[in-house]
């Protein structure tokens, strides 16, 4: 016997919402999913009329659903926003080159301007080349740092007021767990914030999908027949986040509400008044936001260019010793060449 839609629309239920357990027809699920995102946007005052917003587009399910819903809600509720797509090409053969085709399809489907920036043009390196130097153990460190700054660079080029990212509830819960396990109180303080950055020297980032479950995003994309790229990054299996994700999935089996529980716990965390956070400023080399001098992106890039790819991995003191040692070796080499030329 078919189950009726809980919204009492008279239709048979087509699915069960992972977030609430409600049996709904497709149309009522769409309405509920979109209404929740609209509530998140309006209650958190993420945007103001007349603003230009860059939607971070990767071609994956999250960014595709974000672009679709942002366009839909902007028109339905008259937000008055100018929406553009911003995509970063990390230079990963067999992954990003294919996903960018999906991003271009999103551009055509949603009639949004698209800007693509590559690591190669920004840093002179692709992730494929970086991995050939560093190996697969720390590649996500490079990619994450470069990608965050690349989005800032792209946003500045586009002169946008904010960047909307596709981080969903699962992503945020995983990040809370990762920061707890690593003892990273600085990131733990801000990882549940729906808006980060902002101020004179940085463009704020917002997370309209903060309370949207990954499973529901997949269901929405599936039933809406949205075009998205579903292949996982070829370097992702070695990421530390994967362990947090697996742990979260195990917890979800025994406590279905654990994703929202972790997010709410992260939002309510209190820290000692004596706990110190790094002061966020701007990098004295590249001019982009940073809590260290020089910024992590500049340190990693310097290491690559010096032939010391592990320069930015680990403590700063270790990196300083590596630079000092290399400079000393270069000086000795130059001195030896001068002596040789004298003869």
Curated annotation (Swiss-Prot):
Q: Name one GO biological process term.
A: tRNA thio-modification
**Chief place of localization:** cytoplasm
Pfam families for the chain: ATP_bind_3 (PF01171), zn-ribbon_14 (PF16503)
Q: Which domain of life is it from?
A: Eukaryota
Task: Name the enzyme group at the top EC level.
Answer: transferase
The answer, when asked if tRNA-binding is one of the entry's keywords, is yes
* InterPro entries assigned to the protein according to its UniProt record, in alphabetical order: CTU1-like_ATP-bd, CTU1_C, Ncs6/Tuc1/Ctu1, Rossmann-like_a/b/a_fold, TilS/TtcA_N, tRNA_thiolation_TtcA_Ctu1, UPF0021_CS
- Can you say where in the cell this protein is located? Cytoplasm
> In the UniProt record, which is one GO cellular component term?
mitochondrion
CDD domains in the record: CTU1-like
- Copy the pathway line from the protein's UniProt record: tRNA modification; 5-methoxycarbonylmethyl-2-thiouridine-tRNA biosynthesis
Q: What are the alphabetically sorted keywords of the record?
A: Cytoplasm, RNA-binding, Transferase, tRNA processing, tRNA-binding
EC numbers for this chain: 2.7.7.-
Q: Name one GO molecular function term.
A: tRNA binding
Q: Which HAMAP family match?
A: CTU1
Q: Which NCBIfam families match?
A: TIGR00269 family protein (TIGR00269)
Record-stated family:
Belongs to the TtcA family. CTU1/NCS6/ATPBD3 subfamily.
Which purpose does this protein serve, as stated in its record?
A: Plays a central role in 2-thiolation of mcm(5)S(2)U at tRNA wobble positions of tRNA(Lys), tRNA(Glu) and tRNA(Gln). Directly binds tRNAs and probably acts by catalyzing adenylation of tRNAs, an intermediate required for 2-thiolation. It is unclear whether it acts as a sulfurtransferase that transfers sulfur from thiocarboxylated URM1 onto the uridine of tRNAs at wobble position.
Q: What is the designated name of this protein?
A: Cytoplasmic tRNA 2-thiolation protein 1
Q: Which organism is it from?
A: Drosophila persimilis (Fruit fly)
